[in-house]
Regions:
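ATP-binding glycine-rich loop module of kinase domains
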Residues: 1-41
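Conserved structural core of kinase catalytic domains
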Residues: 25-66
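Activation segment signature within eukaryotic-like protein kinase domains
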Residues: 71-72
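Protein kinase catalytic-loop region centered on the HRD/HxD motif
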Residues: 75-88
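Activation segment/activation loop of eukaryotic-type protein kinase catalytic domains
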Residues: 91-133
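Conserved end of the kinase activation segment
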Residues: 138-150
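Conserved C-terminal C-lobe helix
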Residues: 181-196
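A conserved short helix/loop substructure at the end of the activation segment
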Residues: 194-205
C-alpha cells in the first residue's frame, strides 16, 4: 500500500483490493472517495491522510481514555457495517491502516476480509505473525485454511485499543492490566472482546 499526495486535500492510495467496500467504509465517516482503477482509490476533501505508524510517531506512547473510546467506536462502526453486509475482517493490520484527519482510522487490508458463513469465516490467505494486534485465534495457528468465529476480529480490535490506552508491553495478563480502568465503559468492552471463547465476545456502540 502506497499513499500519494495529489494536492492539499486530495490523496491517492495504491495497492488495494475491494475498493467498492472501502468506499462504503469511508462513507461511514462522510469521507468522499472515488477510483479510476480497480486497485487504487482517491480520497478528496480531507485535511490529512497518513499511515498508522506515521500517526503514532506524533503521539505519546499511550493516548488518553476519551481518544481510546473514540478509536474503539470508529472500528466498531466499521465492524458492525461489515457484519451487516455478511463479511468480517480476520484481524487489524497496522501496516495497512490509514488515519484521516488525525482521528478517523480506516483499515485497508481488505484482502483479509471474508464472507461470514454460519457465523464462521475461513481464512485462506497467509498473514504475518509479526503483528501485535493479531486475533487471539490466529496467534498460535499455523494452518491455512483456518476457520474461526467471525467475532475473532473483536480480540484484534481490543488488542489495538489496549495497546494504545494501557500498553501491551506493560502486562501480558490483559484482565489484570485492565484494572487501571476498572468500572469504565472500555473496561467492560475490552474484557468481553478478549474472552477466550470468541462466540461470547461483544462490541457495543453507545
Amino acid at each position: 500500500m502506497n499513499i500519494e499526495k495529489l494536492s492539499k486535500s486530495k490523496y491517492k492510495i495504491i495497492g488495494l483490493v475491494r475498493t467498492n467496500v472501502l468506499r462504503d467504509l469511508l462513507e461511514l465517516f462522510d469521507i468522499r472517495s472515488y477510483n479510476d482503477k480497480e486497485n487504487e482509490i482517491i480520497i478528496d476533501n480531507v485535511k490529512t491522510l497518513e499511515k498508522f505508524h506515521d500517526w503514532e510517531k506524533n503521539q505519546h506512547p499511550q493516548i488518553n481514555y476519551l481518544s481510546a473510546e473514540e478509536m474503539f467506536d470508529n472500528f466498531a462502526a466499521i465492524s458492525l457495517y461489515l457484519e451487516k453486509i455478511g463479511m468480517q475482517l480476520s484481524h487489524i493490520d497496522p501496516t495497512k491502516l490509514v488515519v484521516v484527519n488525525s482521528n478517523i482510522f480506516v483499515p485497508m487490508n481488505l484482502e483479509d476480509l471474508y464472507i461470514i458463513k454460519k457465523k464462521q469465516i475461513t481464512i485462506d490467505k497467509p498473514y504475518s505473525k509479526d503483528n501485535n494486534y493479531l486475533s487471539l485465534e490466529l496467534q498460535e495457528n499455523s494452518t491455512i485454511p483456518h476457520t474461526v468465529h467471525f467475532k475473532s476480529f473483536y480480540s484484534s480490535l481490543a488488542l489495538l485499543i489496549y495497546d494504545k490506552l494501557i500498553g501491551l508491553e506493560n502486562n501480558t495478563d490483559y484482565h489484570e492490566g485492565l484494572k487501571v480502568i476498572f468500572g469504565s465503559r472500555l473496561y467492560w468492552i475490552l474484557r468481553y472482546c478478549l474472552l477466550e471463547n470468541a462466540e461470547e465476545r461483544l462490541i457495543v456502540i453507545i
